[in-house]
Amino acid sequence: MSVITFVCAGQMNSAITFPAFENGHEVRLVGSPLDRDIIDGLKKDNFHITLKRTLHDGIKYYQIEELEEALEGADLILGGVSSFGLDWFCDEILPVLPEDVPLLTVTKGMVDLDDGTLVPYPHIFEQRQPEGKHINFNAIGGPCTSYELADHDDSHVAFCGKDMETLKFIKSLLTTDYYHISLSTDVVGVECA
C-alpha cells in the first residue's frame, strides 16, 4: 500500500481517488482555499458537492491548513489545480512539496504566453518551482472526464513526464480494469493532443 496525497479537491482530482482507493492505497484529499465547502461536506458524508458522487468511505480529508500533515509519508502527490489556479499552486504549493515524491498534475493543455508561444503545464511548473528545487513533474493527458472516471466507465489516458521509471511507478498505483494508462516521455505531444 502506498500513500497518495491529492492537493485540491476539484472534480478530476477527486475522481482519481476512485482507482487510487480501490487499488488499496491510503488516500488523502486536501482542499484548496476554494474547496472548503467541498471538504466540509466530504467529512460529513463522503458526498462531493460538485462532482455529485459519493467518494469511498475511508478517504482522509484535509483543509489547506492541514497540508503539511497530509504530505507526511506520501509516495505520490496529485495536483488538481485548474488553469485558473496556476499562480496559486506555483506560489503556495510548489515551495512546500517534498522533492523526493513525484507530482502528477491533472491540469491539461498548454499556457499561451504573450508572444504566442504555447508551453505545457509541466514545463510551467518546472520553471516556477523555487530556485534549487527539483520536483519530478508529470502530467495526465487524454479524453477522460471526472464523471466517466467516477462512474467506472472505461477511460484511456496518457501519463507523461521526463522519467519512464517514475511513470511506470505512478501507473502501477492508479491503473485499473477501467482506468487504462499509457506512458510517454513526450510531454509536449501528450499535452497538445
Give, region by region, the residue ranges found by the protein language model:
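Internal alpha-helical scaffold of NAD(P)-dependent oxidoreductase catalytic cores
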Residues: 96, 128-136, 154-193
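Short acidic low-complexity segments
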Residues: 57-73
